[in-house]
Design a protein with these regions (language model features):
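His/Asp/Glu-rich metal-coordinating catalytic cores
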Residues: 2-10, 15-18, 24-29, 33, ...
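Conserved G/P- and acidic residue-centered "switch" motifs that form tight phosphate/ATP-binding loops
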Residues: 38
Length: 142
């Protein structure tokens, strides 16, 4: 089964992009709307009009970017909708507030892992296995 577009999420200008929602994932340049997997500097950029993340990531982002940023927060597992796409954050076990991001559209599930860690860590929520049809995985070390 294919989505209404050939690919719901694609690589564009150095970042992941969902055209249907007009949203970037961990962008490397300022954009209108950015989903952020976690608050490490290689996963967000300064100057986005709006950030969307977990509550914990938002706290860390404000420390790094400044309190004046526009940011929407969601709990793990809490679905929100943008242009008919259901989006939710799920624990990735990497750092405090880190998340995988799931997109559901046209009965297909897409998952972006962001950085993740399978080993238990007392400083963050443990990695959650999320059912998906398409997996886009972070690959820092090759």
């Amino acid at each position: 089964m294919r989505t209404k577009q050939e690919y719901l999420i694609r690589y564009k200008d150095g970042s992941l992009y969902c055209e249907l929602a007009n949203i970037w994932i961990d962008p490397i340049k300022p954009v209108k709307r950015a989903l952020i997997t976690h608050a490490h500097f290689d996963h967000f950029t300064f100057g986005c009009e709006e950030y969307i993340s977990t509550r914990e990531t938002a706290i860390l982002l404000k420390k790094r970017v400044g309190d004046n940023i526009k940011i929407k927060t969601f709990d793990y597992g809490q679905e929100f909708k943008i242009n008919g796409i259901n989006i939710s954050f799920h624990p990735s076990g990497h750092i405090l507030g880190s998340s995988q991001i799931r997109f559901i559209f046209a009965e297909e599930k897409w998952l972006i892992t962001g950085d993740f860690k399978l080993q238990k860590d007392e400083t963050c929520k443990q990695y959650e296995i999320v059912k998906t049809d398409y997996l886009i995985s972070e690959c820092t070390f090759g």
